[in-house]
């Protein structure tokens, strides 16, 4: 199967987060990998009075964001190690991940579940998020679909409708991109080139 070019890949991703927003009425976003880490390229606002605004075009950290944890779980270590080490050096004392061993354990859990939920230690206070990987025709991670909500107002638990919808949306998009195992957490580590500037 021929590779979907970058423009088509992003176009399909944007359509996916729009449909997902309409389905669950939560903030949704699309993240890609850049030389400096994950970058949100676009987000969709839900139809509710209080929402979470998402900054686009800026790299987010790996250990305290949904997109960062998902990319870290499926990218090869050589692509993420330096960024993770730098973040570990400035982790607060109460952060759950203090060593590379802690990180590896967390990433193994994410690969096992195939999805990530982050709340208490999300980089923005009072906000929780979900992230799911999107795989390409080589069964390598290429994007991350993200759902963001306000703690106490959004149900983003591990058995929530939002999580199930996110998982289904990521798998459907993976199939569109030619993945033959979109629902397999063992999809091999990615060797994609970074997208300059996001």
Task: Indicate residue ranges for each PLM-predicted region.
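Amphipathic alpha-helical effector-binding/dimerization core
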Residues: 1-87
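A short, flexible beta-alpha/helix-coil linker loop
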Residues: 1-2, 89-90, 150-154
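Short glycine/serine/threonine/alanine-rich loop segments
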Residues: 26, 115, 179
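Extended hydrophobic
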Residues: 99-172, 189
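Hydrophobic/basic alpha-helical segments enriched in Actinobacteria
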Residues: 19, 36, 47-50, 78-91, ...
